[in-house]
Amino acid sequence: VAAPLDWNPEMSSALAVSIGNTRTQIGRIVDGTVQEYATVSSDTPTEALEQLVAWSKDIDKDERIVLLASVRADTADAMRSLVVDQIGAEIIELEQDLPVPIGRALDSESIVGVDRLLAAAAVWNELKQACIIVDVGTAVTVDFVDGEGVFQGGAIMPGTRAMLDSLTDSADLLPSIDYRRPDGEPFGRNTTEAMLRGVHNAI
C-alpha cells in the first residue's frame, strides 16, 4: 500500500505502532504530535489493538491511517490483520511504503532494522548535530549519525536478558536469573552477583 500523496506527517493525524522484539509501543498522533501513547507486550497484539480501536473512534473512518514499524514478523502479520478487520484503517509500513527520513551511508545490500533508523531520525530531528544513539532492549544498539544527518551504522550486541540466558545455556552450573542493576562493592561475592556484575559492566 503506497502512502497517500497528500499525507503529511507534520500536518496529519494517525495511529502509530512500533513492534519490538519484546515490547510494542503504540501512539495517537494529532497534527504531527504524539498526544497519547502506551507500551504493551509484543506477545499480545490484541492488547495493543484494544487501545488502537478506542483511539480510532475519534477519527473519521475514511481518514484512519496506521503507521506500522516492526522488527518482529509474526506480531506484525497479526497486527495487520487485526487493524484491517477491526479498525478498517489504511496501513502505511515504514521503510516498505514510506522511508524513514534519515540519510544513510551503508553497504548497498545492507538491511537495517527500522527501529535503529527511527531512533536515529528522532534524535537527529531533535538535535541537528552529530550524535551517538544507544538503544537498550532485547539487543543493545550503538549507532552514529554524522553532522549532516546521515546514518553511518554502528554496533549491535546482546541485551541483558540475552547475555544472562547465554550464560545459563552454556554453563551447566550457572543459574537462570533475572537482571537487576548490581549495587554495593564492585566484586560479585556470589555467583548471581558475579553474573549480574559481568553483564552490567559489559553494557
Model-derived features with residue positions:
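N-terminal glycine/serine-rich phosphate-binding loop of ATP-dependent small-molecule kinases
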Residues: V1-V100
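A polyampholytic, Gly/Pro-enriched intrinsically disordered region
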Residues: S110-A121, P175-F187
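Gly/Thr-rich phosphate-binding beta-strand-loop-beta motif of the actin/hexokinase/Hsp70
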Residues: E10-V34, V123, Q129-F151, L167
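General beta-strand structural signal in soluble alpha/beta enzymes
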Residues: I91-Q96, V112-V114, I132-D135
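Acidic-glycine-rich active-site phosphate/pyrophosphate-binding loop
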Residues: A89-P101, T138, S176-E185
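Gly/Ser/Thr-rich active-site loops/lids in small-molecule metabolic enzymes
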Residues: V150-L174
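Conserved phosphate-binding catalytic cores of ATP/NTP-utilizing and phosphoryl-transfer enzymes
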Residues: P4-N8, P101-C131
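Adenine-nucleotide phosphate-binding core of ATP-dependent small-molecule kinases
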Residues: A38, G184-I203
